[in-house]
Amino acid sequence: MSSSKKLAGLRDNFSLLGEKNKILVANRGEIPIRIFRSAHELSMRTIAIYSHEDRLSMHRLKADEAYVIGEEGQYTPVGAYLAMDEIIEIAKKHKVDFIHPGYGFLSENSEFADKVVKAGITWIGPPAEVIDSVGDKVSARHLAARANVPTVPGTPGPIETVQEALDFVNEYGYPVIIKAAFGGGGRGMRVVREGDDVADAFQRATSEARTAFGNGTCFVERFLDKPKHIEVQLLADNHGNVVHLFERDCSVQRRHQKVVEVAPAKTLPREVRDAILTDAVKLAKVCGYRNAGTAEFLVDNQNRHYFIEINPRIQVEHTITEEITGIDIVSAQIQIAAGATLTQLGLLQDKITTRGFSIQCRITTEDPSKNFQPDTGRLEVYRSAGGNGVRLDGGNAYAGATISPHYDSMLVKCSCSGSTYEIVRRKMIRALIEFRIRGVKTNIPFLLTLLTNPVFIEGTYWTTFIDDTPQLFQMVSSQNRAQKLLHYLADLAVNGSSIKGQIGLPKLKSNPSVPHLHDAQGNVINVTKSAPPSGWRQVLLEKGPSEFAKQVRQFNGTLLMDTTWRDAHQSLLATRVRTHDLATIAPTTAHALAGAFALECWGGATFDVAMRFLHEDPWERLRKLRSLVPNIPFQMLLRGANGVAYSSLPDNAIDHFVKQAKDNGVDIFRVFDALNDLEQLKVGVNAVKKAGGVVEATVCYSGDMLQPGKKYNLDYYLEVVEKIVQMGTHILGIKDMAGTMKPAAAKLLIGSLRTRYPDLPIHVHSHDSAGTAVASMTACALAGADVVDVAINSMSGLTSQPSINALLASLEGNIDTGINVEHVRELDAYWAEMRLLYSCFEADLKGPDPEVYQHEIPGGQLTNLLFQAQQLGLGEQWAETKRAYREANYLLGDIVKVTPTSKVVGDLAQFMVSNKLTSDDIRRLANSLDFPDSVMDFFEGLIGQPYGGFPEPLRSDVLRNKRRKLTCRPGLELEPFDLEKIREDLQNRFGDIDECDVASYNMYPRVYEDFQKIRETYGDLSVLPTKNFLAPAEPDEEIEVTIEQGKTLIIKLQAVGDLNKKTGQREVYFELNGELRKIRVADKSQNIQSVAKPKADVHDTHQIGAPMAGVIIEVKVHKGSLVKKGESIAVLSAMKMEMVVSSPADGQVKDVFIKDGESVDASDLLVVLEEETLPPSQKK
């Protein structure tokens, strides 16, 4: 005998209902599953029905049999469940004995109930005539009058015109509520307050009711402010017996749809409760009610109760009544319909009691941060809560389920029960936190905020509590960290790395090992447990910047600054070293280099590259490294009036940025100007002084000052330094960007400065491009420099700084540096491996380039310029590019070359090579050539004023009256940034932001926006090991990712699926902590045309996108239409709810991308406004 026949036999033997035991549920989603469970306990056979769009819905799988409603395309997704005749035909064909309507759809439709009975099938619910007398809210008011139960003032019957609504408003005043006479769930309801558009509200309510319930009839009643919504669960048999199962508090609502329900009501006085329960039973008896239903009341601030309606059906929240009474309401419904009396079921009023409390939360796929906009998509992860006192009633809640825009957004109902309200509240919080739902937005963050609100804790909420409490929307959203990381790893597995500048894969196939340091006795130093030795930062923190500088000057020797964490990897590895690898070695560095003057670790190109290419937050890097290295000062590179940007910014932006840098961990600010323009330099210097940082005002060294006739000679430098000293600086910086300072020049310059300024600390920076930097820095030290820059051996030489070990060897026996040579060697082992890990960013430089004395390309730029030349197809013309760089420099007037001026020279050089132009050609054709923007900016004066002025007539020829000629500091021409407005805009666009976000946006608006998009998609990528950030994972390779202290993800790539030729996607399979996860990724190598509509750019205010997926009911504008801010442009229907899409600004419609009846996805582009018609504040 088959297992199905055995099961059927069991049902026949144990059926409580005899031969009539086949039940069909005319509904979808969660409620059929709930009904099937009770039916199965009664040994019944169950039948599900489903629309074509619901063919993968879970409810059809939970039934013994399931049948589709009609044929594909015959009905709309909602219309299928409203197809009465079709549903009854299915029931008759399959010999159904009972039909249960669930809630919503046809559950309150008397015509359907009548048709079911006439078809010879038992209807589980009140008879049609009772539905007519109570299900219609207007009829319910007549019932209340017969039962002498108070009601809220309202129209005596249904209304058909707007004028009738206006007449009521004129008689009773505002506010009023327009309500659908049929149905519920908050649909077909509109509150109208004074000044609102009554006609529009009436039209929307009737249209929504017609769509949801097939009947657009509405009525109007007085709207009570801040009432409680109390409902009483009723059961009535076919013999006139009625009992109540006590009350539920359903006051926590949004859009008149319940969000959280509590049973019993926590704060309802006993006498009010008793009166409501009595009235509920009285109403049921007067109307001859049968089966399950709910009498609903409002309770005002004076504890007066008003009857609203009887819902002639099972309610979504029946679960919590079951939990506090122990009564299976659905089972009772079925048995009453089969003829059982309440007495036979043991349901006597004096025997029915409550125990404890129960709370139900409806978990939906809605985004609370976007006004509860329904979200659609695929559930990538679904892991539910459980444990003592937790009940789940779900529908299509499983990994892989598709959330459609056609139906209600509820995923699962979570009901928690316990002995006290407070115990249950805490249990619910725990349960919600346990849920893991990924792939769509949910309302869980909102529910958690709601449950912890003091009003909810006290139980004193009211029906508009959510609307009246904006702080409920200050939510802490689920971070979804693991799933976002999987999306990145999946994309990497399918499409490879998209990091700009990466060529090939890392040579190192494992993670670098962290070396051990040893003390003088040979014992291993535990760098994670023992605090690092005190360093120069302790001096700074205790004594302040001035005394710090004084003690640096008094140090008997030459201190070293390690540039490995910034300029070294900028020069050798395209600035691509990640926070992950810096943080890994940071504790060891704090011990090994405890005597160092500073670590250069921030600012300059590292700032924008972190966001632009590494997808990291530079501020998070700074804070993380600061926490790991508390003893060594941090130094950053500040581009004077540019901050860390490439052009001048308003002074208040520089002040704001520097303050954030100081507050988050920067100690010493090397401030420079690319042209040694002292007016530009002063902006940065003053900002550092205001912030309380150490000022290292810096003069940029250019060329070989020993050559006769050079523009930048000793007198020039002495003159610039004198003005810097007058300006006020704690330390003097000398920045030799290209490494052209020869040892003899170093001796002369530093010696001259030391003689003239005996008390001023001098800090020298150079590059080893020519291979002479060790000798030059030795000469500086011997000539009296207080600090020189070096890099760890494996990250030194070529375009980087000189080797720390080579310099230590050169100074050994003559000058103390305070550095332990053995510790440096041990530290170097890590960076030797690290260099291999980042080999895919190495420039193809084989050795020193003494030609630097001719072309003067800065070390940090030389490798980038080589890469750019290769990208532009000029790699084979590298020698020509270097010659062009020298010519370009002289065309521009032989300027100081450091970011951003070095970029100007580089851009002009590449322009010349790619267009085969000589310097003579440039001079001759300047008035007809289209130069790179950076060259135009330079000649305009936006970068500053060069020493000796601009070359004429070239400047005039290049500008050609297209641009002005600035003669003052560019910042003086700029309006201060409105920091408060920027902060507000960023908050609205990106949610939780801080002052560091404002500073980042001020420096690089577009880069910051792109970074935020990446972070929203992939999360914090800085936690990934670099090998797995740059290279696809190997199958079955185990990746450990620590996302916070004590939380480590273990990820394994299982497989990459075949290409889906229709979608162009591949499925990538992972194990995450042993659990299978599947991610879909577009294969970018496939040229598959997408049929998707264009998406609106959320950062472009003249593009209007769909707020959610749904169907366009009405397009209200056309091309050329003039619209006002807030004016409706379209009406969208989704999840049985209508939403008006409004214009964000005044303007004229440029394009319309939709038509009536068209389906759209969330963010699909609907309308574009003419950009020039927008107010200046809203232009992109």
From Swiss-Prot:
Protein EC: 6.4.1.1
Q: List modified residues, type N6-carboxylysine.
A: K735
Annotated Biotin carboxylation domain residues: 19-471
User: Where are residues bearing N6-biotinyllysine located in the sequence?
Assistant: K1136
Which locations, inside or outside the cell, does it occupy? Cytoplasm
Q: From the UniProt record, list the reaction(s) this protein catalyses.
A: hydrogencarbonate + pyruvate + ATP = oxaloacetate + ADP + phosphate + H(+)
Domain called Pyruvate carboxyltransferase: residue spans: 558-825
| Catalytic residues, chain numbering | R313
Functional note? Pyruvate carboxylase catalyzes a 2-step reaction, involving the ATP-dependent carboxylation of the covalently attached biotin in the first step and the transfer of the carboxyl group to pyruvate in the second.
Q: Gene name on record?
A: PYC2
Subunit info here reads: Homotetramer.
Does the UniProt entry include the keyword Cytoplasm? yes
Instruction: State its cofactor.
Output: biotin; Zn(2+)
One GO location term (cellular component) = cytosol
For the ligand (substrate), the binding residues are R566, D567, A568, H569, Q570, R639, T899
Which superkingdom heads the taxonomic lineage of this protein's source? Eukaryota
Q: Give the keywords, sorted.
A: Acetylation, ATP-binding, Biotin, Cytoplasm, Gluconeogenesis, Ligase, Metal-binding, Multifunctional enzyme, Nucleotide-binding, Zinc
Q: Indicate which residues the UniProt annotation says bind ATP.
A: K137, E221, H256
Q: What is this protein called?
A: Pyruvate carboxylase 2
